[in-house]
């Protein structure tokens, strides 16, 4: 295979011409499509980056809202606990006051019942003492006193006993 310089130069010119023709054809028919594909791809990448940035900002806003809601919930929980404590204290005071009032009322009722029982016992004792005194006086004196005189005598005697 002997190739001469003329053939080499001819082949070179043919290949170079074909290459230049191919470049011109690509430039005329395909270059616009190729550049538009690259531009669309660059635009899509740019839009995706913008969309990701927007999503990140939205996520930050949502995170901030969640933090605010959580803080609000904590504050509301603290308020509920404080209100419950205050209500419990009020109920405690009310129950304590009611209990104290009930104890006082029961004491007063017991004192009244004691006083009433004491008065009834004294009346009963007065009657018994009066009867015994009349019997005793009748036996000692040997005579019968009329009821009014006996009653006055007994009342004065009982009053003296009550004062003692």
Swiss-Prot record:
Main subcellular localisation: membrane
Coiled-coil ranges (or none): none
Membrane-topology annotation of the record: Single-pass membrane protein
Transmembrane annotation, as ranges: 5-25
Keywords, ordered alphabetically: ATP synthesis, Cell membrane, CF(0), Hydrogen ion transport, Ion transport, Membrane, Transmembrane, Transmembrane helix, Transport
Entries under Gene3D superfamilies matching the protein: 6.10.250.1580
GO MF annotation: an example: proton-transporting ATPase activity, rotational mechanism
InterPro entries in the record: ATP_synth_B-like_membr_sf (IPR028987), ATP_synth_b/b'su_bac/chlpt (IPR002146), ATP_synth_F0_bsu_bac (IPR005864), ATP_synthase_B_chain (IPR050059)
Subcellular location: Cell membrane
Keyword Nucleotidyltransferase listed: no
Pfam short name (any one): ATP-synt_B
One Gene Ontology cellular component annotation held by this UniProt entry: proton-transporting ATP synthase complex
Family of the protein in this entry: Belongs to the ATPase B chain family.
PANTHER family membership: ATP SYNTHASE SUBUNIT B (PTHR33445:SF1), ATP SYNTHASE SUBUNIT B', CHLOROPLASTIC (PTHR33445)
Role noted for this protein: F(1)F(0) ATP synthase produces ATP from ADP in the presence of a proton or sodium gradient. F-type ATPases consist of two structural domains, F(1) containing the extramembraneous catalytic core and F(0) containing the membrane proton channel, linked together by a central stalk and a peripheral stalk. During catalysis, ATP synthesis in the catalytic domain of F(1) is coupled via a rotary mechanism of the central stalk subunits to proton translocation.
Quaternary structure note: F-type ATPases have 2 components, F(1) - the catalytic core - and F(0) - the membrane proton channel. F(1) has five subunits: alpha(3), beta(3), gamma(1), delta(1), epsilon(1). F(0) has three main subunits: a(1), b(2) and c(10-14). The alpha and beta chains form an alternating ring which encloses part of the gamma chain. F(1) is attached to F(0) by a central stalk formed by the gamma and epsilon chains, while a peripheral stalk is formed by the delta and b chains.
Name under which the protein is recorded: ATP synthase subunit b
């Amino acid at each position: 295979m002997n190739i001469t310089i003329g053939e080499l130069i001819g082949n070179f010119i043919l290949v170079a011409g074909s290459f230049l023709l191919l470049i011109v054809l690509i430039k005329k028919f395909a270059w616009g499509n190729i550049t538009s594909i690259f531009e669309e791809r660059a635009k899509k990448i740019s839009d995706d980056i913008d969309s990701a940035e927007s999503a990140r900002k939205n996520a930050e806003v949502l995170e901030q809202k969640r933090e605010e809601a959580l803080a609000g919930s904590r504050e509301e929980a603290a308020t509920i606990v404080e209100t419950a404590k205050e209500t419990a204290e009020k109920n405690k005071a009310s129950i304590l006051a009611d209990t104290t009032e009930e104890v006082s009322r029961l004491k007063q009722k017991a004192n009244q019942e004691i006083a009433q029982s004491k008065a009834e016992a004294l009346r009963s004792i007065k009657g018994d003492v009066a009867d015994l005194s009349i019997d005793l006086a009748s036996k000692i004196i040997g005579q019968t006193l009329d009821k009014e005189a006996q009653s006055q005598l007994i009342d004065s005697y009982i009053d003296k006993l009550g004062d003692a």
